[in-house]
């Protein structure tokens, strides 16, 4: 029987977790309140540690040792067979813990040798033996925190690993709490188990969405903050459907491009240059009513319509609202809206982008500039909270070759320090990972 520990913010929660894992087969030995420091002492958290053992089968707990459970029962009558009673007590204690078993084994052997000697005596002798055993158990229990601190190095290691990958504080905090809640103490001792569990949660945080199959005209609209690369990304998408895809299918789709970006210097010129290279028409609209006119016209003569929008800061609520007017003008059309975000953005900034651009009812994300970031933790942290799927990822400036279908493995390739990463990336998540439709 092993000495185990459960950690929780309160004693009640710790006991609840113990009961959930082990049922009624537990024996609580000791409770300790601790102040633990995180992030190099900047944050302190109060926790309660409960040390306990688990009874299996017919094994007894410390509370089942004769005269510990009820001393009055022992003191009610004289003991006729002292050594037999000692053996019973010692064997009960032996099943609590391996360390205790090691210390009481010589006492059991000595008692068995004297078992034939029956000397009537008072219960005080048995009571003294019980007190000795209780002291032994308490001493071993008191030494447990040193062992536990070493065993919980796995928690400290995974916390540091997540920090090095730029995961947000909230993601790290939730992951550590979830580890302690869902894994047994035995599993927490193994860093390999801890790492594989956290890696699985990271994978589960990434949701992939396959582009829809449409029978009519597809109206693909890109929205997003300034500087994330919407115009270049839209050119890559247009080139994929107009140049790359026909080589595979043998079918040449009809493609049109519209831009509403009249404010950024050179934006329309940049898109016009891309269209000239691909032999596509570009329409620059100045107002929502003009946008409606061209969208209506293109529904009859085009297979795919791409719409580039002006980039605005997520805190520029006034101009974002003005952009919404364009969308209201075409509210009767089925729009395929994608929010374009920079892979290197901070988690807090991404949360704000998700919040402000929710007005556009985007269906999925396009993650840009994956090649320009060294850490992916901020992105995954934000994705785990928003649960917004990804459809495309860009990995460079080349049109159209640096546009890729979103995949779990592509994002995992940016993680650093996970020894089990190669094994996970060897799993077949398909072209789109965990698909959502």
Swiss-Prot record:
GTP binds at residues 224-231, 308-312, 368-371. GO terms for molecular function: ATP hydrolysis activity; GTP binding; GTPase activity; signal recognition particle binding. It comes from Treponema pallidum (strain Nichols). Pfam families: SRP54. InterPro entries: AAA+_ATPase, FlhF, FlhF__GTPase_dom, P-loop_NTPase, SRP54_GTPase_dom. It is a peripheral membrane protein. One of its GO terms (biological process) is bacterial-type flagellum organization. One of its GO terms (cellular component) is plasma membrane. This is Flagellar biosynthesis protein FlhF.
């Amino acid at each position: 029987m092993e000495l185990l520990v459960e950690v929780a913010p309160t004693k009640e929660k710790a006991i609840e977790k113990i009961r959930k894992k082990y049922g009624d087969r537990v024996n609580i030995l000791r409770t300790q309140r601790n102040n633990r420091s995180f992030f190099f002492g900047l944050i302190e958290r109060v926790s309660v540690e409960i040390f306990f053992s688990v009874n299996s089968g017919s094994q007894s707990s410390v509370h089942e040792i004769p005269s510990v459970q009820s001393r009055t029962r022992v003191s009610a009558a004289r003991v006729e067979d002292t050594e037999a009673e000692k053996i019973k007590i010692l064997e009960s204690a032996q099943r609590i813990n391996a360390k205790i078993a090691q210390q009481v084994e010589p006492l059991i052997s000595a008692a068995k040798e004297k078992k034939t000697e029956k000397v009537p005596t008072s219960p005080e002798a048995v009571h003294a033996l019980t007190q000795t055993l209780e002291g032994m158990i308490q001493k071993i229990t008191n030494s447990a925190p040193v062992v536990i601190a070493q065993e919980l190095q796995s928690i400290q290691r995974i916390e540091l690993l997540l920090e090095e990958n730029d995961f947000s504080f909230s993601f790290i905090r939730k992951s550590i709490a979830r580890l302690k809640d869902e894994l047994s103490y035995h599993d927490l001792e193994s860093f390999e188990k801890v790492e594989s569990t956290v890696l699985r949660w990271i994978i589960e945080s990434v949701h992939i969405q396959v582009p829809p199959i449409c029978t009519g005209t597809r109206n693909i609209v890109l929205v997003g903050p300034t500087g994330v690369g919407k115009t270049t990304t839209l050119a890559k998408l247009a080139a994929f459907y107009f140049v790359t895809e026909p080589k595979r299918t043998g079918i040449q789709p009809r493609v049109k491009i519209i831009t509403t970006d009249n404010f950024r210097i050179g934006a329309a010129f940049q898109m016009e240059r891309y269209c000239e290279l691909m032999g596509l028409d570009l329409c620059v609209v100045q107002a929502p009513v003009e946008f409606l006119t061209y969208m209506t016209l293109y529904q009859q003569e085009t297979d795919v319509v791409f719409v580039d929008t002006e980039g605005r800061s997520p805190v520029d609520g006034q101009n974002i609202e003005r952009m919404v007017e364009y969308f209201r003008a075409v509210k009767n059309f089925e729009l395929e809206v994608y929010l374009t975000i920079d892979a290197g953005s901070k988690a807090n900034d991404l949360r704000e982008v998700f919040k402000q651009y929710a007005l556009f009812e985007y269906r999925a994300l396009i993650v840009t500039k994956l090649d320009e970031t060294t850490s992916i933790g901020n992105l995954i942290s934000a994705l785990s909270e928003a649960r917004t799927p990804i459809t495309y990822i860009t990995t460079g400036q080349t049109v159209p070759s640096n546009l890729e279908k979103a995949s779990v493995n592509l994002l995992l390739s940016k993680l650093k320090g996970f020894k089990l990463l190669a094994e996970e990336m060897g799993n077949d998540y398909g072209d789109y990972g965990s698909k959502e439709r």
